């Protein structure tokens, strides 16, 4: 069954394995996870748990920022006996009997050696060309080429007379939801609410990440 938790990316460091191997790891701090809702097939058509992460400030009538909770959000969190949460995510294929509404989900849900998928929002790179954005090869840099870093052909001229969808063009790069699959948990530090994940995970420092059991290898 799937296990999951939400956290923030602290940064990267390195640890030594038992055989002396140097392992690059990403530090994820995962505290304040609370089960806000349990969904069942009878009522909702599918089974899942809804987890909230990081408290929001209480509702204010003259609020000018989304850091303050709305009245519906306050009512939803009140059913779980907790404060409104800033981030809310669902986890399917979960043993719902093992969770209760209002229960705190801690990092010791996972164990060292577990294989997980980590989802986050990639770093924004701003407006970039086709080479950096899509990995396109550049043209010859020699004198007289007249084709160096341009996107290339836009398509046929007379017949189609249009640029087809999917053409690799310059544009805004990054800021996409990215999932890194089959990453290994190197260490779980329950005292500090920290999980060490082998390798890198999407997003900048302090970015929100979602960790769940690998859909390809986690249930084997």
UniProtKB/Swiss-Prot annotation:
SUPFAM superfamilies: Translation proteins (SSF50447). This is Large ribosomal subunit protein uL3. NCBIfam families: L3_bact. Part of the 50S ribosomal subunit. Forms a cluster with proteins L14 and L19. Gene3D superfamilies: 3.30.160.810, Translation factors (2.40.30.10). GO terms for cellular component: cytosolic large ribosomal subunit. It comes from Macrococcus caseolyticus (strain JCSC5402) (Macrococcoides caseolyticum). Keywords: Ribonucleoprotein, Ribosomal protein, RNA-binding, rRNA-binding.
